[in-house]
Amino acid sequence: MLDKIIRIATRQSPLALWQAHYVQHLLQANHPGLQIELVPMVTRGDIILDTPLAKVGGKGLFVKELELALLDGRADIAVHSMKDVPIAFPEGLGLVAICEREDPRDAFVSSHYAHLDDLPAGSVVGTSSLRRQCQLRERRPDLIIRDLRGNVGTRLAKLDNGDYQAIILAVAGLKRLGLETRIRYAMSAEESLPAVGQGAVGIECRLDDDHTRQLLAPLNHRHTELRVCAERAMNIRLEGGCQVPIGSYAELEGDTLWLRALVGAPDGSQMIRGERRGPAAEAEQMGIELADELLSRGAREILAAVYLDNPAR
């Protein structure tokens, strides 16, 4: 059935298009002769650029329109950054493949400073991520953290124009766009714990579309799937969204999974951290247990306050 054209729903940003072309390349490498076309779309998250992401709220800020295209038959698969994928899917849709993960770390980007610790007091650092903001404020309460929206090119332009002394971006996005020279250094997980699924590309489709699911099966990277499964299980238990001060990062060491997580107050005044080590086969259960530990230690109250401040979530 290679005569059927597979339509990929994707956002129109340069990074999203890179991801869609990446999936196209993988599909055609595994299935020579397969015809593929891209269906570029604009999401709500792409349109509303003058408001912090946490204030815009809404589940699926960057994926809802793509999912609608799957449901009404305009597309066969949707390609997402895993960190943007909500904790629940519309009925009939699901995540069927997670590609091999790129570097999941955050990148410190600055025109004049080599390291976060080199920034003078009062320096302005740009990021709209509450996860990044709370960790920055804990480490450097003397900095001014300001929201920063737009695609990667827009954010770099604002840095270059002098609006910020530094900005925090994802290493994976910069590398994929050929902009790795802009990275001053990749921040360790101890310094900035990554977002759930950061650096991984996920593929969603209709669950009853057996043909497309068979085509996608070779694209799933088992090690990445286990790591992201643990991270997402933790996030689901916390009822976290994409725009909350939650970090989670799993590493595989042989058959052992090491899962770290944090929930932080946006002002950096409270940070609840935890970790688990166990068999990789128990990735999901580890995520649930770690979330329960964080909730019992005060994460519930922190998240309740965040949701009260950002009711649109």
Swiss-Prot record:
GO terms for molecular function: hydroxymethylbilane synthase activity. Transmembrane segments: none annotated. GO terms for biological process: protoporphyrinogen IX biosynthetic process. The keyword Magnesium does not apply. Binds 1 dipyrromethane group covalently. It holds the Pfam family Porphobil_deam. InterPro entries: HemC, Porphobilin_deaminase_cofac_BS, Porphobilin_deaminase_N, Porphobilinogen_deaminase_C, Porphobilinogen_deaminase_C_sf. Its cofactor is dipyrromethane. Keywords: Porphyrin biosynthesis, Transferase. Gene3D superfamilies: Periplasmic binding protein-like II, Porphobilinogen deaminase, C-terminal domain. The keyword Membrane does not apply. GO terms for cellular component: cytoplasm. Pathway: Porphyrin-containing compound metabolism; protoporphyrin-IX biosynthesis; coproporphyrinogen-III from 5-aminolevulinate: step 2/4. It catalyses: 4 porphobilinogen + H2O = hydroxymethylbilane + 4 NH4(+). Its EC number is 2.5.1.61. The modification S-(dipyrrolylmethanemethyl)cysteine is found at residue 242. Monomer. Tetrapolymerization of the monopyrrole PBG into the hydroxymethylbilane pre-uroporphyrinogen in several discrete steps. The porphobilinogen subunits are added to the dipyrromethane group. Belongs to the HMBS family. This is Porphobilinogen deaminase. It comes from Yersinia pseudotuberculosis serotype IB (strain PB1/+). The lineage of its organism: Bacteria, Pseudomonadati, Pseudomonadota, Gammaproteobacteria, Enterobacterales.
